[in-house]
A protein has these predicted regions:
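N-terminal secretory signal peptides and thylakoid transit peptides that target proteins
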Residues: 1-18
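Boundary at the C-terminal end of the N-terminal hydrophobic targeting segment
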Residues: 17, 22-27
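A short glycine-rich, His/Asp/Glu-containing loop-to-beta-strand
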Residues: 28-62, 126
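Histidine-centered metal-chelating micro-motifs
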Residues: 60-62, 80, 97, 101-110
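Short, conserved beta-strand element in jelly-roll/cupin
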Residues: 69-80
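Short acidic-glycine-tyrosine-enriched beta hairpin
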Residues: 85-102
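Ligand-binding loop in jelly-roll beta-barrel domains
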Residues: 87-88, 103-129
Length: 136
């Protein structure tokens, strides 16, 4: 039951964010901007967190992994990202990407050398455990 509540709550938050972007862009009604299969997980003892990640112009994060599921939504600027076997891609405001458990996030950086960038990471992870592990 908790698993459903967490997933429904996370999905509702993402839909509200989609509504906000649509309203700001002058669009009407909800639209699907992202869909991705997720692994079959038992999520007892897990929690959902919203983490804002801000990048100064040209700034990047070191390669890392998340033991849980991370859904990233670009709030400002452009984010250059490479997750798992997917090709490196630039995401713009309103676009999303997902990191499934323990996938290598090899590239995470601001695509601009002159403008800031920001994303919201909705992270589903085990309570009391680190959300991120830096790649050695």
């Amino acid at each position: 039951m908790m698993t459903r509540r967490v997933l429904i709550g996370s999905a509702a938050g993402l839909l509200l964010a989609d509504e906000l972007v649509a309203a700001q862009a002058g669009a009407s009604g909800p639209r699907v901007v992202f869909e991705h299969d997720v692994p079959d997980l038992t999520m007892k003892g897990w929690s959902a967190s919203g983490v804002e990640v801000s990048y100064a112009p040209g700034q990047s994060s070191p390669p890392h992994r998340h033991p849980g599921i991370t859904i990233a939504y670009v709030l400002e600027g452009e984010i250059r990202s490479k997750v798992g076997d997917e090709p490196e891609k630039t995401y713009t405001v309103g676009e999303m990407f997902i990191e499934t458990p323990n996938q290598l996030h090899a590239v995470s950086r601001n695509a601009s050398d002159t403008k800031p960038a920001k994303l919201l990471a909705v992270m589903l992870s085990e309570k009391g455990k680190p959300r991120t592990a830096q790649e050695k």
